[in-house]
């Protein structure tokens, strides 16, 4: 059952990614699908990573855990062994130290930046058009726009919905990934939204 759910979600993400590549006329270096770790929902991220679809990227987002550097190293090592792109959320120093492929910035960090961090790949979280445009001005590689649907990770946040997601995607030239409440059951609703791919937590557990 888990394998089938993951396969359907990965297929939906690849379909979005293919449409995006056709539109922009160039290949994308980033995966079509990303898994976000979570300190509460994925206390053992290594076990979850083992079950991910082939080619699925990983954003290490365990912020408030003991021995964060050691866990980040283990995650980056596991991703390298499975040929997965690993991005570390937060500062670029930890991402560099553990050998990750890049860094992912939460929106509050994105807003404070005036220049792009010196990392091969830099992505950011965005919840508004202002954040999207700031990421674009900095020359980031992609943004994760959320929450698309209602999500346990942010129960009080107002979901964008398909129309809101589509509208914001059109505001930027950056690749935009849909995040927040994404599952194999609703991913197909974003087929015409112009996104570059999908990202999930619970949808990949």
Model-derived features with residue positions:
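Short, acidic/polar
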Residues: 38-52, 91-93, 128-134, 183-188
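Conserved, mostly hydrophobic/aromatic
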Residues: 35, 58, 95, 135, ...
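Glycine-rich phosphate-binding active-site loops on the catalytic face of alpha/beta enzymes
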Residues: 106-115, 142-156, 181-205
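Structural motif
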Residues: 51-55, 98, 138, 171, ...
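Hydrophobic faces of well-ordered beta-strands that scaffold small-molecule active sites
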Residues: 31-37, 58-60, 86-88, 103-105, ...
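Alpha-helix-loop-beta-strand connector modules within alpha/beta enzyme cores
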Residues: 69-88, 107-110, 115-128, 158-183
């Amino acid at each position: 059952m888990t394998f089938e759910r993951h396969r359907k979600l990965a297929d939906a993400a690849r379909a979005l990614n293919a449409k995006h590549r056709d539109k922009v006329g160039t290949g994308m270096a980033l995966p079509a699908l990303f898994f976000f770790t979570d300190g509460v929902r994925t206390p053992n991220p290594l076990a979850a990573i083992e079950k991910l679809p082939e080619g699925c990227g990983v954003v290490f987002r365990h912020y408030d855990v003991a021995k964060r550097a050691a866990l980040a190293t283990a995650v980056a090592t596991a991703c390298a062994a499975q040929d997965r792109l690993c991005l570390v959320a937060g500062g670029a120093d930890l991402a560099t130290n553990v050998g990750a492929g890049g860094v992912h910035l939460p929106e509050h960090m994105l807003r404070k930046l005036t220049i792009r961090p010196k990392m091969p790949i830099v992505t950011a979280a965005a919840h508004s058009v202002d954040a999207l445009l700031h990421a674009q001005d900095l020359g980031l590689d992609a943004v994760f726009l959320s929450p698309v649907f209602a999500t346990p990770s942010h129960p009080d946040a107002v979901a964008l919905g398909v129309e809101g997601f589509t509208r914001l995607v059109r505001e930027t030239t950056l690749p935009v990934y849909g995040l927040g409440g994404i599952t194999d059951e609703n991913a197909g609703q974003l087929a015409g939204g112009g996104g570059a791919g999908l990202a999930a937590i619970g949808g990949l557990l």
